[in-house]
């Protein structure tokens, strides 16, 4: 098999790539990289991804990193439905607008809050200062409100009437914050309906990709983390 996906389904962009490949019926060989065990730090993996992150893809001996770039490549290299990344330049631009916006918004703010509330205490054994943590939470909430009030105000998907790669990336990022006890859908009806549409359009692979995250979310809730900031 010429296409290899290096991934860990606890990684938001890894889930997005996994879902896309499955939904589009693109054959690939999955190479699980266990982040918890530090497998991404192995010298062998550094030859695939110089910065030792996931996901990464190897296609016919050519290595690729960065999920947005990989998704664009897959849309151009394989015969996938046009709505994922339209050939029409204006429609394509709408997808690119979100992809560029996401870096410093959905990706940065959701991932930062998750890291500061869950990962940093796990790695250091020290809880985050509540006031500092609240600042991360506020930035994340503002991003979710922007999604609710701008990106999803008058359309079914982020960039139009049909699902695109932007929707998979965005939804996978947002799912992560459930693990730290935050419900992104609360008081956001547009976002709630959109996330359901994304899951339905990519079923059963969306659900499959989130099995582990959902299990960990339940475990964290039992431990009472949801009662923190």
Regions found by a protein language model. Give the residues of each.
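GST-like domain detector, emphasizing the conserved glutathione-binding G-site
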Residues: 1-134, 138, 153, 225-226
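GST superfamily/GST-like fold recognition
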Residues: 105, 109-114, 158-186, 192-198
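Surface-exposed helix-capping loop/turn segments at secondary-structure junctions
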Residues: 80, 149-161, 202-209
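C-terminal helix/juxtamembrane-tail motif
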Residues: 211-229
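Non-transmembrane alpha-helical segments in soluble domains
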Residues: 71-75, 96-99, 141-144, 148, ...
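Short clusters of hydrophobic/aromatic residues that line enzyme substrate/ligand-binding pockets
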Residues: 45, 83-85, 157-158, 184, ...
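Short coil/turn segments at secondary-structure boundaries
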Residues: 111-112, 209-211
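Conserved beta-strand edge residues that scaffold enzyme active sites
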Residues: 35-36, 191, 212-213
